UniProtKB/Swiss-Prot annotation:
Family: Belongs to the PAPS reductase family. CysD subfamily.
Encoding gene (name): cysD
Name used for this protein in its record: Sulfate adenylyltransferase subunit 2
Coiled coil stretches, renumbered: none
Family annotation (CDD domains): Sulfate_adenylyltransferase_2
Known role: With CysN forms the ATP sulfurylase (ATPS) that catalyzes the adenylation of sulfate producing adenosine 5'-phosphosulfate (APS) and diphosphate, the first enzymatic step in sulfur assimilation pathway. APS synthesis involves the formation of a high-energy phosphoric-sulfuric acid anhydride bond driven by GTP hydrolysis by CysN coupled to ATP hydrolysis by CysD.
């Protein structure tokens, strides 16, 4: 029996849009029954959030999972627009192509986007090189997210995290309760039976909601291929200037990156499996320039998509600690 329940009453009323060409390959005719169940479950969750919470928001980090989540939200509420704004927590160190893609997609879809930068972090000039990855992530991501949620009074934040990404996310509920201080207690999670979710909140508390919890990385790529979802070009292989640093291929994205003695950027064919702040995100050698090629590459891969994330190397259980402090 499948772990994913069928949601026959929440299918999308709109067909996938005919979007721009993504690598010169035709889209498949229909998704598999497995992907259809995942899609229906995610749409059901998105509609549940809209119905149950006073002021929800969708986190938009510009990556592949956010792109799928945004596509699902557009389907869930078609022909109207999603009844909640998008929020991007900008660390000021994102890849330039990510910001350009973000602005383009928001214009195309005509959505409301809130962008928040931690003003204290900017004043202190906190960055990954000057303060280290742990401090940078805490100030410019975790603290910034808490600031934005408090400033706007959001009681539910929708995100694109998946359980297969990392072990702390594997044990987190789809509707993940947060205290008034935005803290997550992994020992105090609510049961989720079938498609029944406990959305009750005490004053000051909030919920993080993960509609893609049951998706895998391969599911994401297969769905992007079938639905022809636009994604940041960084996911496709291309010749890019990188330096090999601490076991990771780091893209020299702008003049703020200081080169170590002896480092010389090399042009290599690379792409990214995951996207974050460019000094903290390693590329992978690849020749996959189309979506079908990426799917084939994923099917043969035996490594984690987060192997290039420098922040995951801070310490043992670093992700769980970050989440307990309010990280998404």
């Amino acid at each position: 029996m499948s772990d994913i329940l069928d949601y026959p009453d929440v299918s999308s009323p709109a067909a996938a849009p005919d979007l721009a060409d993504l690598g010169g390959e035709p889209a498949r005719a229909r998704p598999s029954s497995h992907l259809q169940r995942l899609e229906s479950e995610s749409i059901h969750i998105l509609r549940e959030v809209a119905a149950e919470f006073r002021k929800p928001v969708m986190l938009y980090s510009i990556g592949k999972d956010s792109s799928v989540l945004l596509h699902l939200a557009m389907k869930a509420f078609a022909p109207g627009k999603p009844p909640f704004p998008l929020l991007h927590v900008d660390t000021t160190w994102k890849f330039r192509e990510m910001i350009a893609f973000r602005d383009q997609r928001i214009r195309e879809l005509g959505l409301d986007l809130l962008v928040h930068v931690n003003p204290d972090g900017v004043a202190q000039r906190v960055g990954p090189f000057s303060h280290g990855s742990a401090r940078h992530t805490d100030v410019m991501k975790t603290q910034a997210l808490r600031q934005a949620l408090d400033a706007h009074g959001f009681d539910a934040a929708i995100g694109g995290a998946r359980r297969d990404e990392e072990k702390s996310r594997a044990k987190e509920r789809i509707f993940s309760h947060r205290s008034a201080a935005h803290r997550w207690d992994p020992k105090n999670q609510r049961p989720e039976l079938w498609s029944l979710y406990n959305t009750m909140l005490a004053p000051g508390e909030s919920m993080r909601v993960f509609p893609l919890s049951n998706w895998t990385e391969l599911d994401i790529w297969d769905y992007i291929l079938i639905e022809r979802i636009p994604i940041v070009p960084l996911y496709f292989a291309a010749e890019r200037p990188v330096v090999e640093r601490d076991g990771a291929l780091i893209l020299v994205d702008d003049e703020r990156m200081p080169l170590r003695p002896g480092e010389v950027p090399q042009w290599r064919s690379v792409r990214f499996r995951t996207l974050g702040c460019y000094p903290l995100t390693g590329a992978v050698p690849s020749t996959a320039t189309t979506l079908p090629a990426i799917v084939q590459e994923m099917m043969a891969s035996r490594s984690s998509e987060r192997e290039g994330r420098v922040i995951d190397r801070d310490s043992t259980a670093s992700m769980e600690r970050k989440k307990a402090e309010g990280y998404f």
